[in-house]
Amino acid sequence: MIRPFLASVTRISDLSATNITTTKLARANWNTGDYVVGKVLDTRGHLSAIELSGGRMIEVMEGDLVVGALGTRVATLEAVGDWRAIDDSGEFNALTAAGLFGKTTSLSPFLASPMHLQYHGHVMRNQAKVTMRGSLPEIEITGFDIPVILIVGTSMSSGKTMSGRVIVHLLSQMGLNVVGAKLTGAARYRDMLSFGDAGASAIYDFVDAGLPSSAVDEATYREALPYLLSLIARDKPDVVVAEAGASPLEPYNGAIAKEMIRDHVKFKLLCAQDPYAVVGVQTAFQRSPDLVAGGAANTDAAIALVKKLSGLPALNLMDPSSHAQLEKMLRKALDL
């Protein structure tokens, strides 16, 4: 078999390019989180980048093999897809560059067509499927009692990761042991790696709990999140900067994530694309964040409109002059 490329959803496994054995399985035996191999089809007019297990991006070519995992994506601004939509042809797409595999069912007109692949088989070992959750080491599920700075958004691409980097950097500069985490969303290692670059001593996301995305049934997510929180707790951080994917109202289980860590959230940042979206979140959840950032705070006019519409403070975190005020707010929230 051609040596395959291992997408970043495989980083929790012991798979390597030299130990991949595949078998084609009947659809009744497929499930979320199964590691599968896809053969890249025509790349003309399609996205062709894959994020490797270490985070490096590569461009694949027609005929290359890629190892990823079956999953679901429900992005409001880019692509929607599900492995359950794969038909008898066995053709599917890379719904993210991290190797989240499924069939695209809806695509933004502003996004190039996702990578097109042909089902080559399930990754097998000792006549059993190799899966994401089956690759996890057993750990003790412990209580979680760590202060959390929670970042939520009105949608994807609302400024959450950029804001998270700023917060991680400020907290680490204060001498705190900071862990970065992404609790919900669709697999992509790049965002968490950027938290590490900003000063986080460790980074985790739902992939570390065996999920290709958090768009799974509620019971599965409620089982996976304590595993993720226990991983974080083992590092004994002073504070966790946690991103809750896109909007809590989207089917990524963001509302459940908020519920399960609610008692530990010391500061909540809402990233919004415009001031009116801030009001939408206030109305939907009947509660307000401590601060607004993202596109809704790009200019003085936007900040003033946020205040007028919602009564909330907003900061343009892309402007370094705002960081002193943010630091003051964080110190107060963490009682430093």
Language model segments and positions:
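Conserved catalytic-core segment of NTP-binding enzymes
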Residues: 77-78, 95-100, 105-133, 218-234, ...
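Fold-independent oxyanion-binding glycine-rich loops
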Residues: 40-41, 69-71, 106-108, 153-155, ...
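N-terminal phosphate/diphosphate-binding loop that engages ATP/GTP or pyrophosphate donors
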Residues: 169-215, 283-287, 297-311
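C-terminal accessory "lid"/substrate-recognition subdomains
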Residues: 1-36, 188, 204-205, 210-212, ...
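Short glycine/serine/threonine-rich phosphate/pyrophosphate-binding segments
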Residues: 160-166, 188-192, 248-253, 277-279
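Walker A (P-loop) phosphate-binding motif
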Residues: 133-186, 297
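N-terminal accessory targeting/assembly segments
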Residues: 1-76, 81-91, 97
